[in-house]
Amino acid sequence: MVVTLKPRNILFIEPGQKAARWLLPDNDHIMSDSSDIREAATNGNAQRMIATAVLVKSTTGSPESVSGKLLLFDPSGRTIVEVANNGRNIHLTSLSGGDLTILYERNRRLVLTAFDPGSLAKRGEQEIDVPQPK
């Protein structure tokens, strides 16, 4: 039997700051899914972190069947955006064409949401109808 432990919170520590900050106000949740969004490496330079998307779910119930809160935050944790309050899974994150995009499941539908990669301001959201296979 394999047991996978999921993180419950993220601690942000910044050089020169005396106090650290937690992403969440408590440890009563798990981060069932996460995805780092990075800028492509150029000329041998390391990839630069743009943001992280995490799906935060209650510790009660099965993480696979419970919906949760989808958050997007910058590397310092100072800018935190609530993307959705009833997300199920993060399917894809990407940075292309000047947009940071997240494809996730909400209410048994796929949702594609675009953000500005600098400010994390929402630029648009589109629900995608997925037909049942025959």
Where are these regions (language model features)?
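Surface-exposed loop/turn elements that mediate protein-protein interactions on large endomembrane-trafficking
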Residues: 5-34, 65-86, 111-130
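Mature extracytoplasmic/lumenal regions of exported proteins
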Residues: 57-58, 68-76, 94, 104
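Conserved beta-propeller blade repeats
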Residues: 28-49, 86-103, 129-134
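Short beta-strand elements that form the blades of beta-propeller/WD-repeat-like
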Residues: 1-12, 47-64, 97-105
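Short secondary-structure capping micro-motifs at structural edges
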Residues: 37-46, 53-61, 67-69, 82
